[in-house]
Regions:
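Active-site glycine-rich loop that binds ribose-phosphate moieties when present
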Residues: 130-137, 141-151
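Short hydrophobic beta/alpha edge segments that flank linear recognition/processing sites
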Residues: 163-167
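Loop/turn positions that initiate beta-strands
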Residues: 104, 154, 158-161
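Short loop/turn positions at the edges of beta-strands in beta-sheet-rich folds
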Residues: 95-97, 143, 153
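Electropositive, beta-rich accessory/interaction domains or terminal extensions
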Residues: 1-128, 134-135, 168-230
Length: 230
């Protein structure tokens, strides 16, 4: 895809709500709705975009970006995706897939500048929303997770704005696709984890997970239960 065609397709936010799955009621803010017009982006993301858990959001996870190119795949395997934001993302993009961006890269959108911090680690709430228990694992194995960014320069952006991609300064440039593989799939790749830890701009949540993993010599006591819906 040419750089000229990369753009922001939609901006979405969500509030806390309850979704039902079998006999369970699950509180979540995973249901996002597209916003119209120009949207102000602060250091913590979109005002009014709620999070149920304290460890969701924060400077390293201010916004979730999801490439719209993945929607056709998910529809082909049976997911009913309608509006942008269906995969719980804040920014739905055309272009800049997980293979295109690396930890520490910058993206200029309108007057906003964000920096790529870490791959997304999907959880069971996506499974509950779509009634598909395997969905979080499928997202990890396909690599179609999206990625989380920190806000470097707050400002205003809107759907249709161009995405201007700038490489970061990391000596070892690790794509989100590779970072996601190391974090979410190949959990015994200690060498890969050490490489990822060498990138200063890596988000602190992932850094904490990988530091413990390396110290243990492999996956140890990690929260893989987040993937599974009872």
């Amino acid at each position: 895809m040419s750089t000229a065609s990369r753009h922001l397709l939609a901006i979405s936010s969500g509030q806390k709500s309850v979704i039902n799955h079998g006999s369970r009621s699950i509180e979540t803010a995973i249901v996002k709705q597209p916003l119209a017009g120009a949207v102000t982006i602060s250091p913590l993301g979109i005002e009014g975009d709620e999070h149920v858990y304290e460890h969701h959001g924060g400077p390293d996870m201010a916004l979730l970006i999801y490439p719209s190119e993945h929607y056709s795949y998910w529809r082909s395997v049976g997911l009913q995706l309608h509006d942008a934001g269906a995969m719980a993302e804040n920014f739905t993009t055309v272009g800049l897939l997980e293979t295109d961006v690396a930890i520490g890269d910058f993206i200029n959108i309108g007057s906003v500048v964000v920096q790529v911090a870490q791959p997304r680690s999907p959880c069971f709430k996506l499974a509950a929303r779509f009634g598909r228990k395997s969905l979080p694992v499928e997202m990890q194995t396909t690599g179609y997770t999206g990625y989380l960014v920190r806000v470097i320069e707050p400002g205003v952006c809107e759907a249709g704005d161009a995405l201007l991609h700038e490489s970061g300064t990391a000596v070892d440039r690790i794509s989100i696709a590779d970072a996601g593989r190391i974090l979410n799939v190949d959990r015994h790749d200690i060498e890969g984890a050490q490489r990822l830890l060498s990138v200063t701009e890596l988000g602190e949540t992932v850094r904490s997970t990988l530091t413990a993993r390396v110290a243990a010599g492999g996956q140890h006591g990690e929260d893989v239960d987040r993937l599974y819906l009872d």
